[in-house]
């Protein structure tokens, strides 16, 4: 069985550590939206919706080649009150004793439960159930033909398959592989850790890790 983001079987994360202010603000909005899911998406058929968020936070590691760009990003974080903290690579073990500081010049993280990851399947079902209760109709089937529709804006819900329906829209699937890893030591409180020097990330999942 293929695991795809479009099918709700992939990894879905919630963060505010972006470079652009617009993305930071979107991250802040999504946090409030997710916190209100139990009340805002409650329905008769789904009285207790949840996204099962794990608020372990984000830890991003930067080598000398990426550090300057991240220092600029931190100015936007501060302006947007993103709650991001910054430490030197040499200080890493004071906060995260299980992280190697080798090759790391600086690191940013959050420790106020504002970042983490969610269950995409539960979130999708909560949105779908609420839409149905509000009158939306879901029809299963394949698109066989298209006709011209005049509109100021169109939202494609076809995900990575958009190009199969609308050839002039440059949206294509991109492979993203996630591995489940077993390690001798389990650190359940570990944040999602992204090493920008290697492109590798990892986070706890149950008693294992996803990477």
Predicted regions and their residues:
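Dinucleotide-binding Rossmann-like beta1-alpha1 core, especially the glycine-rich loop
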Residues: 14-95, 199-201
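Single conserved hydrophobic/aromatic residue that forms the stacking wall/gate
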Residues: 2-13
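Helical element adjacent to the flavin cofactor pocket in flavoenzyme catalytic cores
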Residues: 110-144, 149-152, 157
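Alpha-helical scaffold segments in soluble metabolic enzymes
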Residues: 33-36, 72, 126, 130-133, ...
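Glycine-rich nucleotide phosphate-binding loop and flanking beta-alpha elements
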Residues: 67-68, 124, 145, 161-163
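Active-site substrate-recognition segment that forms the wall
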Residues: 14, 36-37, 42-57, 158-211
